[in-house]
Amino acid sequence: MLDDEVVWPEDAIEVGRIVDAWGIKGGIKVLPFSSDPQALFSSRRWFLRPPEKPMGPKAAKPLPTLLRITNAREQGDVIVATAQDVADRNAAEALRGCSVFVSRASFPTADVDEYYWIDLIGLAVVNREGQALGNVADLLDTGAHSVLRVTQVETDDQGRSLERERLIPFVAAYIDAVSLEQRCITVDWGLDF
């Protein structure tokens, strides 16, 4: 599909990057950005953004901005996929370096008390006393559990703005409640931590 025919979803989320071709029939290898790549499996429409500097051979025709996925499976640390729009290895190699986006609406429904990181980023964080600790800027994966990186802009004695960062483990011992509707996380965490 050509660029002018494709309408990107407003809720497009970057979920991986095409790293290489797979086989001779146009398969592509995608490095997912999550250890649980279900978003790639649940969507049959992958939106592509080309790299700033092409990594593969120059394409004979414009790169597609939408792939209609016919099959996707895990292969070690990558996802191997085939698409209607990629006919052979040369076409697959031309996609090397493209970022892969899917609609957030196509993500599988999370289980109770499970959240996609993308849904937590930007939420306000308050403690049990109602004191604002900042907003979730990012999450870190420590292997054992996720950690919220909460940032808050504060003013020092000279009136300069300083960004304060708190790292709060995303575990039941510290997380009292998560409300996606109210866009707020309540934590057992003091201002002085």
Curated annotation (Swiss-Prot):
Residues annotated as domain PRC barrel: 112-193
Localization per Swiss-Prot or TrEMBL: Cytoplasm
Domain of life (superkingdom): Bacteria
Subunit structure: Binds ribosomal protein uS19.
Cited NCBIfam families: 16S_RimM
Protein name: Ribosome maturation factor RimM
UniProt gene name: rimM
UniProt entry keywords in alphabetical sequence: Chaperone, Cytoplasm, Ribosome biogenesis, rRNA processing
Keyword flag DNA-binding: no
